[in-house]
Amino acid sequence: MFAFDPYSPAVDADPFPYYRRLRDEHPCFWSPEAQMWVLSRYADIVSAGQDWQTYSSASGNLMTELPGRAGATLGSSDPPKHDRLRGLIQHAFMKRNLLALEEPIRAIAQQVFGPLKGAQQFDFKDVSSQFTVKVLMAALGLPTGNEALVDEQTVRDNAVLMVQSDARTRAKGPEHIAAYNWMQDYAGKVIAMRRAEPRDDLISHFSLAEVDGDRLDDREVLLTTTTLIMAGVESLGGFMMMFAYNLATFDEARRAVVANPALLTDAVEESLRFNTSAQRFRRRLMKDVTLHGQTMKEGDFVCLAYGSGNRDERQYPDPDRYDIARKPRGHLGFGGGVHACLGTAIARLAVKIAFEEFHKVVPDYRRVADQLAWMPSSTFRSPLVLDLAVQ
């Protein structure tokens, strides 16, 4: 008898055989372990993501939700509240000139990856986490140097804890809640600093964003900033890890992008399809829905398995092949529908620059271990350690 528990460590380790069974045999599947339905086909996931009136995010969109977050953030709200938040936050993003970030991101990449020259073996997570937090601090405007409230590693550690769940219970434990509370306290202090002395950074723009006389209130600014730090560290950091994992696994693709860095743009998109770090998100039904012969009831939770939709052969031919020439339009690596990720432009730019600079120092590498330990999170997927050997 087939079973699929999205909170299982076995699913973290290798979800793709489960996804194939789901798509082929159980496209609308009730998981008794998770007490929710699972949608696994690309078309169904896209349709659900667009139909917010039926598939609501207001009860929380993370597979294990944080207290007080549901219904209050961009990812965990529905229109019209979502549209208002998105408009104000997008206004802040538009004021932060993306081109102005390119030079500092490249300087960060050179600073982080340069010391790898001459290394024989290293954990990519060590350098990718440094890069991610430094880029996030530059983009958001988190205080650094003499202004720093805490060290970068503390910010990263708390952000990563926020998205994890207990490896045994698969629920948020006291340490995860404590990390969330710490992050809110930290974000509140930064917001106060930027309101007192605004700068050209995202937190200043969030604090002061105004559209037709409407502004974000204090709680909205706090939760938006807290969520962006969490999502920025884990989404960008997780994707950096998965991209390195793919390039270390597929020699031909790695050699191609090292020889011609212009191919990195397409390789990034294929990695977002093939092995996105954003695997599964949650919705709640606002009415009964019958799909593939199954009736899901109003109030039921539904898991949208983005990672499965990206491997759906109904959408992408030969989906289990990593092909950097594929150009996978419409992939779900950054979500979709009204909740598509707002930070995609910064993420794409940062990853492209990171690997341009990384490959100048370490052009040839492979994974040391075949079997990896994976982060205990039913929402995001990335290795806890990624040891690479230089060839």
Task: Identify the role of each PLM range.
Residues 1-391:
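Cytochrome P450
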